[in-house]
Amino acid sequence: MVKHEFGIMKNNPKPSVGYDAYEPQKYNSISVDDDYIEQIVPRLNDVEFYWHSLDMPAKGLAYCGVTLIPPASIERMIEVIKPVDELSDLKQLLQKAFSENKWVIHYGL
């Protein structure tokens, strides 16, 4: 099965720095099956994220790339995934990041 990876960033991302390197272990990432991410992608298209760096603000997940999820967007993302029972681990990760005011990194396909 194809997976997406989500992890909590220990430090806030820095301007002009790219986060293209695939390093899920660095962020103690969890794996989420693409079948479940596919279900929520359309509902995230109005949520503000960053793709690959802080220099590229965008809406929606970088489905095949790297998404930087700011604390300000985490609550909305939790609302979107709440109805999908299979995303409970992701919901817990997002709640933890939100409570600690941390960024989340997403590695797409």
Predicted regions: what is each one?
Residues M1-W103, Y107-L109:
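Acidic (Asp/Glu-rich) sequence patches and key acidic residues
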